[in-house]
């Protein structure tokens, strides 16, 4: 399959990551679980924060609240979120505000990448509940949990000494912790910038091709 998006070229100033974290009433989107909090922080690809970010609490339906299991209910009670969503925004209001915020940091004609931790779960809910927002983002994403799983298996010391987390299951704090975690992995086990030069990169690529099982 040909990926037409590989033809997209961005200058450094156009490169953006849109970090998003969501809190939900559960993970069963088809069983009626809903978004109750969405936070966004924009960064460049060097992981420099471009703005302090936004956080919006969304009022869930009574059905979604009643659908919560005890674990989720206790989690949102401890974080204080359960006491805030009664005065939260409607889903439509939240999507509009988040979309407007994202577009402030998106150069015209560019769709930034979504970033986060175990971002697949968040993306599933965003695709379902905030399709207009997602239409402005690239279909690719940066998932910090990928680096975590690689570190766990390839660099155990890096994994064991990763920065501690204490976000308390609030979306904005979770984003900052995920961002810091990726900054840590970048310093701990990735080649220092600017990485291998052109000749070294070609040599590495040639070695990979030569040893690929496709050539056996």
UniProtKB/Swiss-Prot annotation:
Name the Gene Ontology molecular function terms of this record: 3'-5'-RNA exonuclease activity; nucleic acid binding
Give the matching NCBIfam families: PRK05359.1 (NF003765)
Enzyme Commission no:
3.1.15.-
Q: What Pfam families has UniProt attached to this entry? A: RNase_T
Enzyme class, spelled out: hydrolase
Q: What is this protein called?
A: Oligoribonuclease
InterPro entries attached to this UniProt entry: Exonuclease_RNaseT/DNA_pol3, Oligoribonuclease, RNaseH-like_sf, RNaseH_sf
Residues annotated as domain Exonuclease: 17-182
- Where this protein primarily resides, as one coarse class? cytoplasm
What does the function comment of this entry state?
3'-to-5' exoribonuclease specific for small oligoribonucleotides.
Family, per the entry? Belongs to the oligoribonuclease family.
GO (cellular component) term, any one: cytoplasm
Instruction: Provide the alphabetized UniProt keywords.
Output: Cytoplasm, Exonuclease, Hydrolase, Nuclease
Instruction: Look up the domain of life of the source.
Output: Bacteria
Keyword Nucleotide-binding in the entry? The reply is no
Disulfide bond residue pairs: none
SUPFAM superfamilies recorded for this chain?
Ribonuclease H-like
The family database entries (HAMAP family) matched by this protein are listed as: Oligoribonuclease (MF_00045)
